[in-house]
Swiss-Prot record:
Keywords: Ribonucleoprotein, Ribosomal protein, RNA-binding, rRNA-binding. GO terms for molecular function: small ribosomal subunit rRNA binding; structural constituent of ribosome. Binds as a heterodimer with protein bS6 to the central domain of the 16S rRNA, where it helps stabilize the platform of the 30S subunit. SUPFAM superfamilies: Ribosomal protein S18 (SSF46911). Residues 1-18 have a biased composition (Low complexity). The gene is rpsR. This is Small ribosomal subunit protein bS18. It comes from the Bacteria. The lineage of its organism: Bacteria, Pseudomonadati, Thermodesulfobacteriota, Desulfuromonadia, Geobacterales. Residues 1-41 are annotated as: Disordered. Residues 32-41 have a biased composition (Basic residues).
Amino acid sequence: MSEATTTTTTTSAPRPGGRPSGPRPDRGPGGPRKKRPFQRRKVCRFCAEKDTTIDYKDPRTLRYFITERGKIVPRRISGNCSKHQREITEAIKRARNLALLPLAAGHALP
């Protein structure tokens, strides 16, 4: 009684939706990606203008740091330093609790 073993070889066909095997192609017909031009670093406006203060009772100032959807704008976009970003976040949350600022996009601004 000998058992016959059959060996099957599978060809490496690309799976549907998978990445093709082999070396990476070039970046496309346009060639390699171009580098972005140097962008000027944003400066914290509260550090630059010492007379401006962060106050939760001033929704006009805080609206600058809120998106259309009602989310708090991150530091990398607003350009604030970490100290003032924390103060802004705290002030926005306090203003939301007092209904001076909207909680979400569907709520109207006063």
